[in-house]
């Protein structure tokens, strides 16, 4: 990472110019810590006050103090971001665990639903069997109804015959009564004849 550092006096600047052997330079040099090299840019401002360079207006460079303040504020921001990211990571872990638990619950509910589906299928089969049994019973009931009708018709015929027989019996009883009357008369005649 390159760090921008100001010259604190002209001698330091000229020493750096001699080391790098480049033309005229600004009052800033950049140290590349990775390559151990020094770079310059722009024009050198020779106005030094209290061993600090005068930064030209509209310059893109800052003082070491400003740079350190900026760096510190960035470090604080990075720390806050890291803290926030860590908290968000924990929240993500908790959410992941919650999602996994919900996934397990969903799997359990799916199994319950499948079991209910199987039970419903069994109940449907039972209802279908009962429906078939009801149809068979209805057929048997119809057959029994027809048999009962035949029996009732037979009984009705027998009842009609019995009625006819009763009528005949009544007629026979009437005839028997008449015959008894005749028999009584005959007995009386016989008695009369015997008494003579």
UniProtKB/Swiss-Prot annotation:
Name by which UniProt lists this protein: UPF0134 protein MPN_501
Family: Belongs to the UPF0134 family.
Organism superkingdom: Bacteria
Record-linked SUPFAM superfamilies: MPN010-like
Native species: Mycoplasma pneumoniae (strain ATCC 29342 / M129 / Subtype 1)
InterPro entries: DUF16
């Amino acid at each position: 990472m390159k760090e921008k550092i100001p010259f604190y006096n002209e001698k330091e600047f000229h020493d750096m110019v001699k080391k790098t052997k480049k033309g005229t330079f600004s009052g800033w040099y950049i140290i590349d810590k990775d390559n151990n090299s020094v770079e310059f840019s722009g024009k050198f401002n020779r106005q030094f006050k209290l061993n600090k360079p005068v930064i030209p207006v509209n310059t893109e460079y800052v003082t070491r103090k400003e740079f350190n303040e900026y760096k510190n504020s960035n470090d604080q921001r990075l720390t806050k971001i890291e803290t926030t990211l860590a908290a968000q990571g924990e929240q993500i872990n908790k959410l992941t665990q919650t999602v996994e638990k919900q996934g397990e619950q969903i799997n359990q509910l799916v199994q319950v639903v499948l079991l209910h589906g199987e039970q419903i299928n069994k109940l449907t089969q039972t209802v279908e069997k009962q429906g078939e049994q009801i149809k068979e019973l209805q057929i048997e009931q119809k057959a029994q109804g027809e048999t009962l009708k035949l029996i009732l018709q037979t009984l009705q015929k027998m009842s009609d015959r019995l009625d006819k027989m009763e009528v005949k019996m009544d007629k026979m009883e009437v005839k028997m009564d008449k015959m008894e009357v005749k028999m009584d008369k005959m007995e009386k005649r016989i008695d009369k004849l015997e008494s003579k």
